[in-house]
Amino acid sequence: SGIILDKNVLQDINQRVTQEIDKLYKDIILQLNESYSSINLNSPKQLEELLFVHLNLPAIKKTAQRTSYSTDHEVLKELSKIHHIPKMIMRYRELFKLKSTYLESLLDYVNSCTNKIHTTFSQTSVTTGRLSSSEPNLQNIPVDGFLIRSAFKSQEDNLFLSADYSQIELRVLAYLSQDKVLLDAFEKDKDIHAITAAGLFDQDQETISSEQRQIGKRINFGILYGLTAHGLSKELNITHSLANDYIKKFMSQYVQLNQWMESVIEDAKSKGYVETLFKRRRYVPGINEKNKNIFELSKRIAINTVVQGTAAEIVKLGMINLDKAIKKNNFNAKMILQIHDELILEVNKSDIEKVSKLVKDVLESVVDWN
C-alpha cells in the first residue's frame, strides 16, 4: 500500500510557506522597537517579555510549572481579542509548525524506491480505541493541510476516493441514549446544530443565524468531551452565568440524553469500568474519587469512552467488511489511509462508480440500528 508523495510539489509548497513565514516575521518586527529585532517567536520566555512587559497585555495564566506566564495557543487566542500582534504570532506559529512538522519531515519518510510514504497504525495508543498514526502521523495534518494534500498522488489511471461517516459520534450518542430529539433529527435528516441553537435561544429553527448555529454546534460536540460552564464561557467569550444557562437548556432539551449520561456514570461507579457497544472495557479508577477535579475528569472519560469507543469500533468493523467486499468483487481498489471517521481508498478509474456504491453500502450496514 502506501501513498505516492510528489517531492517537487512538497518542496514548492515548503518554499511558499517559508516566504509567508519570513514576511509575517518582518511585519511583526516592524511594529516593535529595535530591541526585538531578532526575537525568537517560538521562545515562550521571549514572548512572555514581549507580550506582558513591552506590550503590557494582561497575563492570563501561569505555566504548568507555575514559574512563568503562559504564552500558549489558548492565551494568544484570548489576547488576540484586544491586540492584533498575538493574532499574527498565532499565524506565525501555525505556519512554522506546518513547515517543521510536515513539509520538512515528510520528505524523510519517502521510500526512495517507490516514492511512497508508509505510515504506522496503532490499535492501542489511544485509550478510547481509536486508531493512531505515526512515523509519520497522517491523521493530524492541520487546517493548512490542503496544501500538503496536493502533494499526494494516486498511481496512473487511479483516483482517490474519500468516504466520511457524517457526525458518527453524535449518531452513536443518539442510538445509545435513545433520546427522542436526537433520533428524530437524524432519522429525518434535520440540522441537529440548528435544533440545539433553537432550544438555547428560544427561537424557531428557521430564524437561527449562522453564529447561533455555531454555538449549538460547539455545545453538541462539547457534551461528548465533558463540556463545563467554565470551558464554554471561555470558548464563546460569554459570562459564566450565561454559559451555565446554555448547558441547563441543553439538558432540558435532551432529557433522555441527560438521563443516559447519568446512568453511565452510576454504572461506572458500581462496576469501576465502562463498556462500548461492542463490549470493549475501560476501567475508570477515579470515578469514586472525593476529589472534585479527579471525579469530573473521570466522568468525562466515562462518557467519551463509550461514545468515541463505539464510533471507533464501527469504523474498524467497516474497514474489515469493506476489505472483504473489495476482494470478493475483485475490484481494483485498496484502502490506503484511515483518518478517524474517514477512509481514503485508491481506486482504478474503471471501478470508481461501483466501488463508490460498495463503500456506501458496506459502511452504512455495519450496525443494525433497529
Segments (PLM) and residue ranges:
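Short, contiguous acidic/charged loop-to-helix segments that flank catalytic cores in large enzymes
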Residues: 107-110, 162, 182-184, 207, ...
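Conserved "right-hand" nucleotidyltransferase catalytic core of DNA-directed polymerases
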Residues: 1-144, 157-159, 166-169, 229, ...
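C-terminal structured "cap/appendage" subdomains that terminate the fold
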Residues: 322-370
